[in-house]
């Protein structure tokens, strides 16, 4: 189900419709201002994948409230699929993320509860006397990931390291990196994307492509 709130997200909206048509998947567009349609559209036989067209917290909260108020939701299999900025409020709605098997895609994942990131935050504050500027992604962590990536590549391949980046991967805290050159005259592009999935049993699964 595509939950449309009439925001200007045409490419995202049309992209999912195209994929559904190509794969022969059944879908229904539900107006966010008429969420009774959501209840009526639920299947008790197959998994219901709900894709809000807007990535906003307001839309997410509205959907969760509607799902929570539905009868017999325990017997309905639901997955919600969103965009990268869901991580900005995933801590606030952790219970809902787990209950509804929330999955989102992103080029990065900032998890302040991750031990390595928590240690980086402490070291940053000790060195610079202040907290990192709050943003998504966190630019201090991104700078560390990029610095370690290119320094390790240089250490392994020497001055011609840029010719070998398609063969090289490095550990990361926030941003997975894998650079490829689109053509001989072009620059390098990071082609990594991450899918983050919350399970009803409290697990968080990260898959990188």
Model regions: which residues?
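Extracytosolic ligand-binding ectodomains
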Residues: 1-209
